[in-house]
Amino acid sequence: MKVTSFILIILFGTLLNAQNRQRPVSVELGKFFNEDGKRMLYGGKKDYQHFDVSNLSLEEDQFHYGLGREAFPALLEPEFTSIQKADKQWDDDDRFLVAKSGNDVKAYSIKDLTRHEIVNDELNGKPIMATYCILADLGAIYTRTYGDKVFTFALSGYTYYDPEVWDGLDGFVFWDRETESLWWPLIGKAVSGKMKGAKLHIYDETKWEDTTWSTVKSKYPNAKVLISGQDFERPTSWRKYEDVSDVKGL
C-alpha cells in the first residue's frame, strides 16, 4: 500500500510538471519588462494597468499566461436572488460556497465563481470575498478589512506555481485595486507592491462551507443566492492607499 501511494504521488507530480510546461510562460511572452527603472508586469492594453513588481518575491519564470487584469469580471457590487427563484436553475448536486454571519447567509455557486473567480461582497455589514480557483480546485471565503482600510480584489490574469507549494499546483494570482499589490492565495499573502508580506485572512471557517445546492436549500432556506451572468463596466480609476504601513502587518 505504501509503495502504491508513493508511486501515485510520483505520477501526480510528474503530471503537474508536464501541465506546467505546457502552459504559456509569461516571461517568454514578454509580459515582464523594465520601465523608468522599475520592473513591470503587463496588466492590460492601457499603460496605467501594468503592475510595478520591482519588489516581487516570486520567480518570474514560474508565472503563466498574462490575460490582463480585467479579463475576469471579479464582481464589485454582486446581486442576489432568493432560494425559491434560484432553485429553478440549480441541481441538487451543484457545488456552492456558503458564508453566514448572524441572519445573513450568502450562497455562491462554483459554476459562477469559475467565471468571476472573485466576488467582493459584504456579509452582515463586514467586507468579505468569495473566491474559487478552477486550476487548483480551491474555494474559500476571505475577509477584506485591514485595520481601518477595506481592500477590493480582482484577478491579475496570471497563474503561478511553485514545485514546493501544494505539489506544484498552478493557482491564480490576485491583485488589489487600492495598492495594486499582487497576492498569491496558495501561500496566503501579498507577493509584491505596498502590501507585500501582508497575509490573506480566511473568514472564520466555522461560518462558511463548501457544499451542495441540496444542503443550501435544507440548511439555509433564507439564503441569498448569487445571480448568474452578472457583468459590469470595468473601473478606469479607483481610490488609492498611499500609506499602508499601519495595516499590512495585521
What is the role of each PLM region?
Residues 19-250:
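Mid-to-C-terminal functional-domain signal that highlights helix-capping/loop sites
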Residues 9-18:
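Hydrophobic h-region of N-terminal signal peptides that target proteins for export
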Residues 2-9:
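Sec-dependent signal peptide recognition
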